[in-house]
């Protein structure tokens, strides 16, 4: 026998999960890789039993291999997510989209004239950024498990949530700075627009990741 049965593949999958590999895409990838190694070993020596082949494959991989792959995959996905985030935000700062970003900034600046205390207005703007954690948290909670499975790519894409609490502290700091130096209103609004673009880009990328996963693994 050179090919593993569905039952044997299920046994290998359970073995992979025993190493605390909880992410579905990694479980599938590592199971496929382990199975292919076992089948290669079996072709070389068809007289071996399933458990003998599995033991030889285990020796090739080592005890730490699976967690090392998980760690490496996290780094790769994080770098790719950061790259996509930078690209998406940069697109908003290129012609013609930058015109909309500039007009939005001008609108925010003009609104500040209607406030007796512009520093309070600026603080409120940064406080509003915190509200973007609501849709991202919703997407994460809703898709934390898709068909009962957890995905590392979804977890990485929702990592932006951890940044939102900082906006509260930033709002207080900005408020004090603008109160002492009103000239900082314009650069502060520019900063706010960029952070706003990061927030909406984060929501867009998270939804995109979830959609791609559902298509790739044919999930609903």
What are these regions (language model features)?
Residues 19, 23, 27, 31, ...:
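Aromatic-enriched hydrophobic runs in primary sequence
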Residues 48-107:
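Cytosolic juxtamembrane regions of integral membrane proteins
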Residues 1-66:
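N-terminal, intrinsically disordered, low-complexity segments
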Residues 5, 31, 46, 74, ...:
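Intrinsic-disorder-associated interaction segments
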Residues 86-220:
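Hydrophobic alpha-helical bundles in membrane proteins
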Residues 1-12, 16, 78-85, 139-157:
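Cytosolic-side membrane-entry/anchor segment at the start of a transmembrane helix
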């Amino acid at each position: 026998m050179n090919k593993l049965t569905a039952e044997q593949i299920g046994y290998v999958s359970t073995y992979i999960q025993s190493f605390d590999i909880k992410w579905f895409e990694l479980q599938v990838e590592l199971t496929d890789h382990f199975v292919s190694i076992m089948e290669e070993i079996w072709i070389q020596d068809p007289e071996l039993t399933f458990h003998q082949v599995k033991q030889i494959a285990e020796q090739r991989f080592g005890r730490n291999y699976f967690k090392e792959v998980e760690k490496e995959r996290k780094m790769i996905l994080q770098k790719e997510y950061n790259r996509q985030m930078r690209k998406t935000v940069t697109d908003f700062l290129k012609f013609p989209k930058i015109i909309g970003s500039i007009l939005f900034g001008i609108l925010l600046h003009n609104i500040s004239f209607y406030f007796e205390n512009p520093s309070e207005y600026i603080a409120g703007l940064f406080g509003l950024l915190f509200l973007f954690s609501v849709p991202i948290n919703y997407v994460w909670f809703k898709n934390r498990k898709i068909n009962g499975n957890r995905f590392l790519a979804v977890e990485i894409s929702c990592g932006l949530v951890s940044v939102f609490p900082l906006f509260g502290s930033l709002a207080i700091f900005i408020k004090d700075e603008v109160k002492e130096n009103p000239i900082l209103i314009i650069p502060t609004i520019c900063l706010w627009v960029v952070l706003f673009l990061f927030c909406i880009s984060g929501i867009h990328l998270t939804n995109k990741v979830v959609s791609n996963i559902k298509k790739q693994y044919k999930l609903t």
